[in-house]
């Protein structure tokens, strides 16, 4: 960045998308400040790296900064945003700052409605093992790093591309991965799936003439836009028509294995510690990126063997008395189906108890019919109230009504517990040894899983 930019302020610095960029900037030597509503492990880490962290939002927080970075969760009437504009300090979206980082490197941007964080984590792990040493900005904590960001010495930057508000169009990556295209964020994409597809086409076609698009042939919407892609691309999937494909898939507990092929040539077996057939596709995307950067297949295999998963993506939190507690970020019906299928395929003999917290009133309304039928792989389902994520309630949209409709559509064991903090006690009354208890959602449902795990431990020691 131009030399006169010295201090960068993040509004909502504790957010998973903001903190990674802030950490990279700190490692680059910039002065970084930020505000958030509460202290967390993330804010503690940034403070330990030299960040100035303040809790609560106030006009005084932007008095001496050169630029203010905001996420989509920050409203225009935020006092720091208002004061920055009054002082004529530039206020930019998170994606614009990520784009600036990407201009310093060759960018590898992973986009798609689902699977971005896992795929980005796989790419980061495999490229690091392959000697590429990329800079990394991920929307989740990579378990082997203990953080969601790292400044690498190599010439590539690996990052997620967030499509939720179209801001990923600010990025100009050299390699663009699209895992899938689905209907989501319909409060922004008022034109529905066709507008979403158009936006992804624009994103793909922004790569330079020497770049590469990596596209999932298993996804119907991606297949439909292929004729509109004007840049070089490779496809991946399970079909024999895909350039990079998987066969002989094995799902055993928390381990996934498959044989990888490139244009009919059998490359070899890949194995990694993360359950679910959907993660085979994520791994194929990673292989495509690594091959483009000439990472030997043997190093790709070794990289996957070291992959330790990512926070809040089928993350095993602990096990007490034969009861395993798992947490997952899934909050869209397609993600929920894939996550529950992963649990069932990996541990077919175990009962799957799911505690789900819907995320956003608007998403619950727009995808209500899909939510009603996406939980059939759950043996026991408990719903708690919707996590608003800053939204106002919408009349007629509630977790209680969703639970009623799920029950009407054939789900046998469905319970509604309004207060999320009451979930741990409720779970204690219904679980039995051998169960997998899965907390599911993009809000704060993970806290209920940790509280439940603590209660199990207390009961064991009593």
Swiss-Prot record:
Keywords: ATP-binding, Cell cycle, Cell division, Cell shape, Cell wall biogenesis/degradation, Cytoplasm, Ligase, Nucleotide-binding, Peptidoglycan synthesis
Binding annotation for ATP: 112-118
E.C. designation(s): 6.3.2.8
Gene3D superfamilies documented for this protein: Mur ligase, C-terminal domain, Mur-like, catalytic domain, NAD(P)-binding Rossmann-like Domain
Enzyme class: ligase
GO molecular function: ATP binding; UDP-N-acetylmuramate-L-alanine ligase activity
Reactions performed catalytically: UDP-N-acetyl-alpha-D-muramate + L-alanine + ATP = UDP-N-acetyl-alpha-D-muramoyl-L-alanine + ADP + phosphate + H(+)
Pathway(s) of this molecule: Cell wall biogenesis; peptidoglycan biosynthesis
Subcellular location: Cytoplasm
Superkingdom classification of source: Bacteria
Main subcellular location: cytoplasm
Family to which the UniProt record says this protein belongs: Belongs to the MurCDEF family.
Annotated function: Cell wall formation.
Record's protein name: UDP-N-acetylmuramate--L-alanine ligase
